């Protein structure tokens, strides 16, 4: 009842937020930080029902530990903000093609990272799609970055949610990261032979999430992930990288809340 009242107060507007604490931070397929980070996602908008949901999204990342002087002189890492459009195309009972189109700007300030632009603002388009169904859900994300960080990034995988007693659930998933030659250079560093990277997959992640849904508006979750660079050449280059978080294999986890109104 409380959830229905909260949703009714906002309708036809909506608000979503996911505050998290992560032991490490993977950004666009690259292990950017191997220390604890705070990540917050938020979205506010208007649900037209017929033509989808229009809104504004925000993504903030901050450090929970002291900064290393080679990378930061403040805790703030970066923020993203921009308009979004979401639309669900019903295909059959319990089947739907879910789309999420985003136009965003990423703001970095006083950030120094090997093989990546820093201390600037760049913009990008991103499309997320998934085929919701009762069985195995395939999903993908593709992002095209502009203004100094001109590269294409993608993520693709599958997941399955299992309901458990007492409003508990678990969701295993597996997905790969990859992109254009420039994105692989950003992820792995330069090729040892000096040639451009061939576009493709650079890493894979195995994820297991478990959570508890109090109601339709609030759930708590925890997760663990195994992140691995794939390909002998990729692993060799990443192992030689001077970047302080260039681990070929890394286990990370986190906890968080999901709020929807």
Task: Describe the function of each predicted region.
Residues 204-261:
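Predominantly the C-terminal beta-signal and adjacent terminal strand-loop region
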Residues 1-16, 245:
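Cleavable N-terminal export/targeting peptides
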Residues 19-23, 40-46, 83-89, 101-103, ...:
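Residues on the lipid-exposed face of transmembrane beta-strands in outer-membrane beta-barrel proteins
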Residues 58-157, 236, 240-245, 251:
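Outer-membrane pore/translocation modules
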Residues 15, 49-56, 92-99, 133-140, ...:
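Repeated loop/turn-to-beta-strand initiation elements of outer-membrane beta-barrel proteins
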Residues 21-27, 48, 58-66, 89, ...:
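Transmembrane beta-strands of outer-membrane beta-barrel pores
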Residues 118-204, 209:
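Detector for outer-membrane/organellar transmembrane beta-barrel domains
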Residues 10-70, 85, 252, 258-260:
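Short glycine/proline- and aromatic-enriched beta-strand/turn motifs that initiate or cap beta-hairpins
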